[in-house]
Each structure stands twice: as C-alpha cells, then as structure tokens.
C-alpha cells in the first residue's frame, strides 16, 4: 500500500496541479528540456539520479514502464533539492515508497519519480503513554509486531498489510475492522511545493475509507499514533490469527492487495460483488482475477500493466451491470491515458 487511491493519476506538478503523465510520453522536446532542467538541479545527489528508470521492479505488481527521471532519496536533507528540481522543471512528481499499492502503465511516467524506500525506519515507543512515533519507511507488519511485544494493542490489524507507514497514512490503510485513522494523532510531511516540513493533525488529512486529502507533493516523513495498553500474549495470539487468515484467504505472487474499495464498508464488499458477477478466475492477457480472493488481481511473470487496467475496467463494468455499484480503485494508477476513469 504505499500512497492514496483518491487520485487515479497518482501524480501532479510541484505547483499542486494535476500532472498529465500521458502527455509527452514519447519523450517530446518539451519533456526532454524539463528533464534536463531537473537533472541539473539534482546533480548534488550524484548516482541517486537516473534517467529512464524502470519502475515495475519497485512495485508489488512487478510490471510497468520507466520514469523519465528518477531520484532515490536516502535522507531527509535531500528533499529540499528534490523540491527545487520539481518546482523549477515543472515535471509531475510521483512519490514511491514500497510500491505495494501502485500500478504504472507500460508506457511509463513522463515525470520525476521520487523513490523513498526505507528512507527512515525509526520507531520511538513510549509505553507509559501508549504513544509512538514511526518514520515513514517503517513496514506495517514490523510496527504491528513491535507494538504488540511492547504490550500495546490497537495495531495488530496491520500485521498482514504490505507497505509502509507513509503509504498507509496517505491512503488510510486498514483491515480487520480498523484503519490508520483509528490511532493516528498527527503526521509530519514535507511539502515539495514550498520546500518545508509541516505537522498536520488527523483532522487536517481528510481521511476517508482508503483515502486522504494528501496529494503527490506531500511526502509523509513520520506519524504519531495513540494506541492502548494491552496484553502482549493476547496481541501475539491475535497477530497469529490474522496472519493465518490472510494466508488462507489471500493470494501471494505479483499483486497489489485489494484492487477496489468496498462500496459500503462493513456491509458490501467489492470481492463479494466481483464473485457474484462470476468473475473469479476471469483473465485478460497476463492478468487474472484471483481464484483465492476475487478482489485481487494477479499478474503473470513478464506481465503487462495495461492488461491489469483492462481487467479492472472489465470487472468494474460487469459489477455495475449486475449490482448497480460502481467500484472505485484502491490502487494508484499512474501513466494511463484513461486512468482518470477510476
């Protein structure tokens, strides 16, 4: 789950306007000029900057094209340099964490991709107050286990969720009856527009079911959570149950978790609607609706992102025909001409 599902395009210009990742994907003269400008501004970051960088390997779908320009950020102090490059060049920006909720078009992304990876994986737990501060790069399963071992409860649900804290905040990740909003107090973000850090309270994040008001220019740096005092052994048992359930009910392989948002959380699930439409196992090219869980799409080795989008489009149309519900993507779609349809 790396970033939010509220924008289908998944990227925008550093000025806050939506960026067209389709425009200039043939690496037009205008794009080349913008890339040159950004690359010059990023020179201080040396080998961390790469042109025509393949993005598929940075996602759990393992498919997708290249970014016109890519920079791997390894420390917070580099972010102002990235902000300057994005602002001056006008390139759309795509922030990539663990790539667990991201589908990049085969044609790629005509902009600046910023790879955070494990930028920072610090966890500071205060057992007295049951609060903690977790850096954006912390993996959700790691935090779930650490908090449980510390005798804190309320974050066990995250043990089976791929992705990091940064992406989880951006999309208000959740599962097993809870989500980030349930324990989130505030987040520290870096704004690529003004080049500064800002602390935002939960009320300022516009958190909804698998969505937030955070956009591409907002780089989540850390999150402060309020949990409950609990029993370490009880939490450990709950974690084991969640892990066992996920192994039994969700597929492995190349996928990005739940594809569509549940239309009515707690009442109407996307998976049930897809199943009722008879689409379990339905295939388009290299993409198939999982036999194990209908709200998962699995991709073959050397698969195509465009097949995934085609299957998503077909599934949504069939579900709307059979149930009247119009599904919304939980995955971030980047670089597709018609990605805005989701």
What is each model feature region?
Residues 24-27, 34-165:
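Anion-binding (especially nucleotide phosphate/pyrophosphate-binding) glycine-rich loop
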Residues 64-65, 69-76, 103-121, 170-202, ...:
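Structural signature of FAD isoalloxazine-binding scaffolds in flavoprotein oxidoreductases
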